[in-house]
């Protein structure tokens, strides 16, 4: 009866291994470049990571640029027209435009500067001077209606294209994947499980691609992240009395470029507007405020908008959360002085330290130990048994507890995480550190004589005198006064008194005043003999 179950589990493990191997071949590890990858995907307007990978592969294998329409080289007149458009923009705006991405039309590219000015260009677009109309300012209402209609149309086309690409990708992935070798004993249940796993994998990939932390809502014609910004509106400065506004007749600026721009009159010079406002001091303040709010270019070149600062300040204030008030809650059991800042911690303390205090007892009659927690009791019970479940992977030695295994493993790894804070001694276990600290405690108890200058302690007063003469020689004359000697009875005289015969005198630290001085000399007789004589 056990053989069919074993065969089923073996087949299940084999199927899982094949599925994992197939999935591992499809995975690509980006490492620390995930953020750049997601930003590139959003910048190019792709919704799936596989679309971006296919685009990069096509661009690498193709001989020409993928963004261009066809492998044919760009005509010279088309490049000249692009240079002309860039030159026209440079006359009106000092910012350098950059390639934003493909436009709405086939083969159309869109350039945009930091001020929001855009212009489109097609390689096949070569206008003649007769076809180029003169530049005429468009009204704000026509621009807004045209932009809204064009954006709605492009969004609808982008959604249809995205849906078509997703369906095609799923079909190709299902077609390319090799079918698993189905065993007739497996049955239809495993086939259903495989289909469900494939569907879950596809849904997970879509969720990961859509719910990445760097995703933004993007439109097909706008490859930049959808940042809320005010709609560009034309800024037309009124000429002075008797002044005729200049119209560049020799520079061909097509209507397609003016229509593709979100703001037709935004190509007018923002710098010239600022210079005009600075020259004319009679302009009211309200007009200056309206023009600075309407023109996006003036916002980019001038000082930051105060309204934006107020908005950001309000957002920052909203995000600041008030710190919760911490209440001091002492334990009300007699004899316990513990204080807690959280009600949950207090209840936990009462439950396991007072109410159910050591309710878990050891089942061994000779032991009689009790514990507050059940896990501590389980670890203790292992000490009474011969079970050694924790085995060292280096030497195959077994242990009863995991803590003993961790300490033993440090012998093989050479790790010594515990360190003495006094001398820097390192060890592997806490018992060795406690034994080492006893030496410092005994030594500190033996050092009874401190130095009054630096606080260093010594075992003998002579060591204090030698230390003072060596480390603090400049402070010794101050301490040789009688008042200072009487005020510090714990320290002997800095220098021992020398007799003419070479006898040295040293002050004793005994409590009795009688033997306060002692005379020691190897070649001189005792002091009592000299007194009698």
From Swiss-Prot:
GO terms for cellular component: nucleolus; nucleoplasm; nucleus. Residues 149-178 have a biased composition (Basic and acidic residues). Phosphorylation at Ser-471 results in loss of DNA-binding activity. PROSITE patterns: ZINC_FINGER_C2H2_1, ZINC_FINGER_C2H2_2. The keyword Metal-binding applies. Residues 481-492 have a biased composition (Low complexity). Residues 190-208 have a biased composition (Acidic residues). Belongs to the krueppel C2H2-type zinc-finger protein family. This is Zinc finger protein 692. It comes from Rattus norvegicus. The lineage of its organism: Eukaryota, Metazoa, Chordata, Craniata, Vertebrata. The gene is Znf692.
């Amino acid at each position: 009866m056990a053989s069919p179950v074993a065969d089923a589990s073996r087949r299940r493990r084999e199927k899982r291994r094949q599925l994992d191997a197939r999935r591992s071949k499809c995975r690509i590890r980006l490492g620390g470049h995930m953020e750049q990858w997601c930003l590139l995907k959003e910048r190019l307007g792709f919704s799936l990571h596989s679309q971006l990978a296919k685009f990069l592969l096509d661009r690498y294998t193709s001989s020409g640029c993928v963004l261009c329409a066809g492998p044919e080289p760009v005509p010279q007149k088309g490049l000249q027209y692009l240079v002309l458009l860039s030159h026209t923009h440079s006359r009106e705006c000092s910012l350098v435009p950059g390639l934003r991405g493909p436009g709405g039309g086939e083969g159309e590219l869109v350039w945009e500067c930091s001020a929001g000015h855009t212009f489109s260009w097609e390689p096949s677009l070569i206008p003649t001077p007769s076809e180029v109309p003169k530049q005429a300012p468009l009204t704000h209402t026509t621009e807004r209606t045209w932009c809204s209609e064009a954006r709605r149309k492009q969004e609808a086309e982008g959604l249809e294209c995205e849906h078509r690409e997703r369906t095609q990708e799923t079909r190709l992935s299902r077609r390319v994947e090799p079918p698993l070798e189905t065993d007739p004993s497996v049955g239809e249940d495993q086939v259903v499980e495989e289909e469900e796993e494939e569907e879950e994998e596809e849904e997970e990939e879509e969720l990961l691609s859509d719910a990445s932390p760097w995703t933004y809502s993007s439109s097909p014609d706008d490859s930049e992240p959808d940042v809320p910004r005010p709609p560009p509106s034309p800024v037309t400065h009124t000429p002075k009395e008797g002044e005729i506004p200049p119209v560049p007749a020799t520079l061909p600026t097509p209507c397609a470029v003016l229509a593709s721009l979100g703001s037709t009159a935004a190509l007018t010079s923002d710098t010239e507007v600022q210079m005009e406002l600075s020259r004319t001091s009679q302009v009211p303040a309200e007009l200056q405020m309206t023009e600075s709010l309407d023109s996006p270019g003036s916002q980019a070149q001038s000082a930051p908008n105060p309204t934006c600062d107020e908005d950001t300040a309000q957002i920052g204030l909203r995000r600041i959360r008030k710190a919760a008030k911490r209440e001091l809650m002492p334990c009300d059991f007699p004899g316990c002085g513990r204080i807690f800042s959280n009600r949950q911690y207090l209840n936990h303390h009462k439950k396991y330290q007072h109410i159910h205090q050591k309710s878990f007892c050891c089942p061994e009659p000779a032991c009689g130990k009790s514990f507050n927690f059940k896990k501590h009791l389980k670890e203790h019970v292992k000490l009474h048994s011969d079970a050694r479940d924790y085995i060292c992977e280096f030497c195959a030695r077994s242990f009863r507890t995991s803590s003993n295994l961790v300490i033993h493993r440090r012998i093989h790894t050479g790790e010594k995480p515990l360190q003495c804070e006094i001398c820097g001694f390192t060890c592997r276990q806490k018992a060795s550190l406690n034994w080492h600290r006893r030496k410092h405690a005994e030594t500190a108890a033996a050092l009874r004589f401190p130095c009054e200058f630096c606080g260093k302690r010594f075992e003998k007063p002579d060591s204090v005198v030698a230390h003072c003469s060596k480390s603090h020689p400049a402070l010794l004359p101050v301490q040789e006064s009688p008042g200072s000697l009487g005020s510090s009875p714990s320290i002997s005289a800095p220098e021992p008194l020398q007799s003419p015969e070479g006898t040295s005198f040293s002050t004793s630290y005994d409590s009795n005043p009688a033997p306060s001085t002692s005379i020691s000399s190897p070649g001189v007789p005792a002091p009592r003999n000299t007194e009698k004589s």
